[in-house]
Amino acid sequence: ADVVVAGGTDACLHPLALGAFARMRALSLRNDAPDLASRPFDQERDGFVMSEGAGMVVLERADFARARGAHVHATLSGAGVTSDAYDVTLPAVEGQTRAIGAALRDAGLTGADIDHVNAHATGTPVGDVTEARAVREAVGLHPAVTACKSATGHLLGASGAVEAVFTVLTLVHGLIPPVRNLEKASDGIELDLVSGGPRRASARAALSTSFGFGGHNVVLAFTR
């Protein structure tokens, strides 16, 4: 196809869904301070905040877009997908690292080419540390890293699409949003985390990571 509309939407705020994730101890317990509850990578994080939303993108073949004079925001240069089936809830760094590596190879990039990573980072104690290790191993310590769920919460099935849009807008505007509520990074998270406010950056290549329960790992590589 010359044009594809792709995205995700989720309306998950229902007692059954909330009860299920609460039973798995995946949700934050900061009910008395909801504005401080979503805090990816922070040493005081205790789970994610469930939310709802939607995000959509229009993907076009490059030659088709040029022929019709479309304004191209960015290029989806590569994608990597793995399914490690390591555990229902616990992430596996190997599967995440392979997904990042596959996206880089598909895009014809190396870790050194990546300026920015929009991390999946939900704010769970184990998940954030695992992802930080995967990013370090597959990309390195140099990219500026943010975690949009600190502001949006976890949109579940819509999070990947929404964060892909965030990543593209970062490339377009040269402005990386900060990780909200990040006061002190947890031990084991040795990344260049954007905090305190937006950071100006002329990023040319960025990754958007999505690492779901059950070992479903997807990484998108965008360039501009």
Question: Each predicted region: which residue ranges?
Answer:
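Beta-strand segments within the central parallel beta-sheet cores of soluble alpha/beta enzyme folds
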Residues: 4-9, 71-79, 112-119, 144-150, ...
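Glycine/charged-rich beta-loop-alpha catalytic/anionic-binding loops adjacent to active sites
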Residues: 35-43, 81-83, 140-151, 202
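Conserved beta-ketoacyl condensing-enzyme motif
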Residues: 9-18, 111-127
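Short glycine/threonine-rich loop-to-helix capping motif typified by GTGT followed
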Residues: 85-96, 123-139, 155-162
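Conserved small-residue
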Residues: 21, 58, 76, 114, ...
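Conserved beta-strand-centric core segments of catalytic alpha/beta enzyme folds
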Residues: 1-64, 159-224
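Stable alpha-helical structural segments in soluble proteins, enriched in small hydrophobic residues
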Residues: 99-107, 138, 167, 171
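Condensing-enzyme catalytic core mediating Claisen C-C bond formation in acyl metabolism
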Residues: 32-109, 115-116
